[in-house]
Amino acid sequence: MTSASPSRSTAWLRVVTLAIAAFIFNTTEFIPVGLLSDIANSFAMKTEDVGLMITIYAWIVAVASLICMLLTSGIERRKLLIGLFSLFILSHLLSAVAWNFTVLVISRAGVALAHSVFWSITASLAIRMAPPGKRAQALGLIATGSSLAMVLGLPLGRVIGQYLGWRVTFLTIAAGATVAMILLARLLPLLPSEHSGSLGSVPKLFRRPALVGIYLLTVVVVTAHFTAYSYIEPFIQTVAGLPENFTTLILLLFGCAGIAGSMLYSRYSDRFPIGFLVTAMLLLLACLTLLMPLSGYPFGLTLLCLVWGLAMMSIGLAMQAKVLSLAPDASDVAMSIFSGLFNLGIGGGALLGSQVSLHLGMDKIGYVGAPLVLVALFATLLSVYRSVRLVHSRV
């Protein structure tokens, strides 16, 4: 912490700065979702093959999160964030001039390395800088920054790519990241590393059954979500037969719903933690199951995507908060594992969606994702049942 306690307005301004950084990182992580067709056309490739770029990015993050976090555990956090943004900006400049798909993937690998550390430390930094008693609201604000990436970043990036080319989209992200880096340098205080944990923390964390359960749940649910979401752009255009502008609208509404989900989380998660998570998982299950049946009805598909975005944001926030509560003594290590596993799910879902699209048809992506949510939901309810029985047996 800083030597003097900041005012509430200063504390919130610092959290907002982190939320802006989250907006930038989340925009670039998912921007390929809105540009798959354009990138595929540029390199004369199949959309399903270009989609593997999402898998490669996510799996680099999955592998690098813990390793990079441990390697940087002793670095002062403001300096670390500026270094991460420098790598981030240079990688996007390379993306903008990529002369073939291999170079584009290499440039995305640089972004993924920056990502792997950023999301390992951001949640704990937000909590650390939040005003007293406002931890959930600080996390909600970071989530809002992430959601705004879906509301503004992803649709805007798609529009820029549609009219000016996908390379200009990456240049625009690099410019935005430069502004964010300047804000971080000017507004954040010195942030010595605290409670980051060490390599010795890892086996201790994996001896906590509840934490391991959250980790497994994360992989399964995120895989289910990204089996369908990774290919929502070509799904809307080829399966639903709707125009490109409708795809942009859907991506916009999905992000808006994510903001609503973060607000609901801030308001209700403390009072109804289990009910909140189970309800969100039920909604996700319904959305994936109904994706194909509602694809022929634009209004129904729009409503489905609203509920889908709300549910997924709620699930992600609930699991992230649970990880932090179960590992307060090694929050950065715990979050790096969470980030890695989250991205393992992203990569697994994108790969599964690609294979489903190639071999079964893109219209099946929702049907393949839904059973995974059902498995996660059953495991959650079973865990709750066992916990209740254990409490009653001790009474």
Curated annotation (Swiss-Prot):
Q: Name one GO cellular component term.
A: plasma membrane
Concerning PROSITE patterns, the annotation shows: MFS
What Gene3D superfamilies does the database record attribute to this sequence?
MFS general substrate transporter like domains
The alphabetical list of record keywords is: Cell inner membrane, Cell membrane, Membrane, Sugar transport, Transmembrane, Transmembrane helix, Transport
**Compartments it resides in:** Cell inner membrane
Transmembrane intervals: 15-35, 50-70, 81-101, 103-123, 136-156, 170-190, 209-229, 246-266, 272-292, 299-319, 333-353, 365-385
> Chief localization class?
membrane
A Gene Ontology molecular function term for this protein is: carbohydrate transmembrane transporter activity
Q: Does the keyword Membrane apply?
A: yes
* The keyword Transcription regulation belongs to this UniProt entry's keyword annotation: no
Report how it sits in the membrane: Multi-pass membrane protein
Q: What induces it?
A: Activated by glucose, and to a lesser extent by other metabolizable sugars such as galacturonate, arabinose and melibiose. Repressed by cyclic AMP receptor protein (CRP).
NCBIfam families reported in the protein's UniProt record: PRK03545.1
What function does this protein fulfil? Involved in the efflux of sugars. The physiological role may be the reduction of the intracellular concentration of toxic sugars or sugar metabolites. Transports IPTG, lactose and melibiose.
Q: Which family does it belong to?
A: Belongs to the major facilitator superfamily. SotB (TC 2.A.1.2) family.
Q: What is this protein called?
A: Sugar efflux transporter B
Species for this entry: Dickeya chrysanthemi
Gene from which this protein is expressed: sotB
